Amino acid sequence: MRLRNGTFLTVLLFGLCGLISLSWYTAFSNSKGNVVDIYQREFLALRDRLHSAEQENLKRSKELNLVLDEIKRAIAEKQALRDINRTWSSLSDETKLKLWNVTSSKNVLQLPSIFHHLPHLLAKESSLQPAVHIGQGRTGVSIVLGVPSVKREVHSYLTDTLSSLMTELSPAEKEDCVIVVFIAETDQQYANSVADNLKRLFPGEIQSGLLEIISPSVHFYPDFSHLKESFGDPKERVRWRTKQNLDYCFLMMYAQTKGNYYVQLEDDIVARPNYFTTMKNFALQQPSEEWMILEFSQLGFIGKMFKSLDLPLIVEFMLMFYKDKPIDWLLDHIMWVKVCNPEKDAKHCDRQKANLRIRFKPSLFQHVGTHSSLAGKIQKLKDKDFGKQTLHKGHANPLAEVTTSLKTYQHFTLEKAYLGEDFFWAFTPVAGDFIRIRFFTPVRVERYFFRSGNIEHPGDKLFNTTVEVLPFDNIQSEKEALKEGREKTPKYQRTEDGFIRIGKFENGIAEGEVDASFGPLEALRLSVLTDSPVWVILSEIFIKKAE
């Protein structure tokens, strides 16, 4: 019995050992299988990555081959272009234009371009690139001043002109302006000598971006030998005026992207003080954007301001007729086309053109040259409005609506006086009459100045007339400015309709500072308190904005 039990235990022990051994073996086998699977997956992933890298390498290799082919093609095309240019130069301008029309576009419609008017420009790639190009490429300014300059036989006025223009600019104005000198000569040696002289005289202005110097390519101008004589002008004068038209076109094309306004000048002028801000504000104060030319001199093409947006139209019109008429006639024709009705008379046409061409007085630029750019011509042109004692004085005032109860005499309106174009003239004022200036947006005003009467009618003054303001924030201004000191005594008198009296006319003039505590003003008013024995002239209005 005992033996049987021992045998049973032995068998049981061996069975357990076998079972444990089998479990260990199974576990070991499974563990080994998992490791193999992991390595197998990693090798497969590595193979995929290597394959992807190989494909990417092939792609890059193809791209590099394409780039190399493009470089080879460009070199070949450049060589072919040289050969084509040699052939092209032997073709007539008419043939060149026809070929350009065929090859320039796949469109059915052929768009007009500068090459239709100047087909010779197709002969050289550099024909529209400046030969001399000095400057910082400043853009985004308010005004670009264009100064074309040509070689004169006797005397050059260019450096004196530039000195005058720059001297009359304030530091802030110099940051808001570009002066472009266009040396309108294809003689490269002469152009370089002028440019070098300007670099020596005005290094700071060039470095700052205020002054730029350009000259045309030797291939820019067409052959002038076949021009037709017209309007009684000899061939040399026809050539001179034709080239001058192209000079203006080149300068305008260069300047049009640099600023908001472009002013055409000449190289033999002097400028009045404050000319830049006067021009800028006169342009901004125009009641309409319909104007095309603002004139700051009555002479020729001096001091003519254009909107930069209008320059492409003007250039294209000039290019169409550059051989036919001088620039001043062409500008008049543009305005005729825009506003004149052929069924109306000449007076109606003149009235319509007057809305496009607006004159500022007094003139801001004076012509000083006596030796014309046309060889042998002596001209003693002077602007009679420059430096002349005028019957009014204009200022750049804040944008506003001006109204009055006074009866205006003829065309001497209050609006013209406020814009600085003329004086205001009205019949005899009576008590209760007013002149009101209502600002389009509230304005902080530092000081005011009103002058009545002028040199021809010194007695036509305002008498017993007060200056009144209407603050935008009436409640706050009353708290801060209407009371003075601890006794709270009135500092200013308030009218029934809310205006505050701050000054009055004495000997025909009212001037003074505006209390800063008033804040922005909504309006300013001149109020007549008693009947006047005479008519009234308002010859100067100046509302100075606070900085």
UniProtKB/Swiss-Prot annotation:
InterPro entries: Glyco_transf_54 (IPR006759), MGAT4_A/B/C_C (IPR056576). Residues 29-547 are lumenal. It catalyses: N(4)-{beta-D-GlcNAc-(1->2)-alpha-D-Man-(1->3)-[beta-D-GlcNAc-(1->2)-alpha-D-Man-(1->6)]-beta-D-Man-(1->4)-beta-D-GlcNAc-(1->4)-beta-D-GlcNAc}-L-asparaginyl-[protein] + UDP-N-acetyl-alpha-D-glucosamine = N(4)-{beta-D-GlcNAc-(1->2)-[beta-D-GlcNAc-(1->4)]-alpha-D-Man-(1->3)-[beta-D-GlcNAc-(1->2)-alpha-D-Man-(1->6)]-beta-D-Man-(1->4)-beta-D-GlcNAc-(1->4)-beta-D-GlcNAc}-L-asparaginyl-[protein] + UDP + H(+); an N(4)-{beta-D-GlcNAc-(1->2)-alpha-D-Man-(1->3)-[alpha-D-Man-(1->6)]-beta-D-Man-(1->4)-beta-D-GlcNAc-(1->4)-beta-D-GlcNAc}-L-asparaginyl-[protein] + UDP-N-acetyl-alpha-D-glucosamine = an N(4)-{beta-D-GlcNAc-(1->2)-[beta-D-GlcNAc-(1->4)]-alpha-D-Man-(1->3)-[alpha-D-Man-(1->6)]-beta-D-Man-(1->4)-beta-D-GlcNAc-(1->4)-beta-D-GlcNAc}-L-asparaginyl-[protein] + UDP + H(+); an N(4)-{beta-D-GlcNAc-(1->2)-alpha-D-Man-(1->3)-[beta-D-GlcNAc-(1->2)-[beta-D-GlcNAc-(1->6)]-alpha-D-Man-(1->6)]-beta-D-Man-(1->4)-beta-D-GlcNAc-(1->4)-beta-D-GlcNAc}-L-asparaginyl-[protein] + UDP-N-acetyl-alpha-D-glucosamine = an N(4)-{beta-D-GlcNAc-(1->2)-[beta-D-GlcNAc-(1->4)]-alpha-D-Man-(1->3)-[beta-D-GlcNAc-(1->2)-[beta-D-GlcNAc-(1->6)]-alpha-D-Man-(1->6)]-beta-D-Man-(1->4)-beta-D-GlcNAc-(1->4)-beta-D-GlcNAc}-L-asparaginyl-[protein] + UDP + H(+); an N(4)-{beta-D-GlcNAc-(1->2)-alpha-D-Man-(1->3)-[beta-D-GlcNAc-(1->2)-alpha-D-Man-(1->6)]-beta-D-Man-(1->4)-beta-D-GlcNAc-(1->4)-[alpha-L-Fuc-(1->6)]-beta-D-GlcNAc}-L-asparaginyl-[protein] + UDP-N-acetyl-alpha-D-glucosamine = N(4)-{beta-D-GlcNAc-(1->2)-[beta-D-GlcNAc-(1->4)]-alpha-D-Man-(1->3)-[beta-D-GlcNAc-(1->2)-alpha-D-Man-(1->6)]-beta-D-Man-(1->4)-beta-D-GlcNAc-(1->4)-[alpha-L-Fuc-(1->6)]-beta-D-GlcNAc}-asparaginyl-[protein] + UDP + H(+). It holds the Pfam family MGAT4A_C. This is Alpha-1,3-mannosyl-glycoprotein 4-beta-N-acetylglucosaminyltransferase B. Glycans are attached at N85, N101, N464. GO terms for biological process: protein glycosylation; protein N-linked glycosylation. Its cofactor is a divalent metal cation. GO terms for cellular component: endoplasmic reticulum; endoplasmic reticulum-Golgi intermediate compartment; Golgi membrane; Golgi stack. Its main location: Golgi. GO terms for molecular function: acetylglucosaminyltransferase activity; alpha-1,3-mannosylglycoprotein 4-beta-N-acetylglucosaminyltransferase activity; metal ion binding. Residues 1-7 are cytoplasmic. It is a single-pass type II membrane protein. N-glycosylated. Its EC number is 2.4.1.145. The keyword Metal-binding applies. The chain crosses the membrane at residues 8-28. It comes from Danio rerio. Pathway: Protein modification; protein glycosylation. Glycosyltransferase that catalyze the transfer of GlcNAc from UDP-GlcNAc to the GlcNAcbeta1-2Manalpha1-3 arm of the core structure of N-linked glycans through a beta1-4 linkage and participates in the production of tri- and tetra-antennary N-linked sugar chains. Prefers complex-type N-glycans over hybrid-types. Has lower affinities for donors or acceptors than MGAT4A, suggesting that, under physiological conditions, it is not the main contributor in N-glycan biosynthesis. It is an enzyme of class 2 (transferase). Keywords: Coiled coil, Glycoprotein, Glycosyltransferase, Golgi apparatus, Membrane, Metal-binding, Signal-anchor, Transferase, Transmembrane, Transmembrane helix. Belongs to the glycosyltransferase 54 family. It is found in: Golgi apparatus membrane.
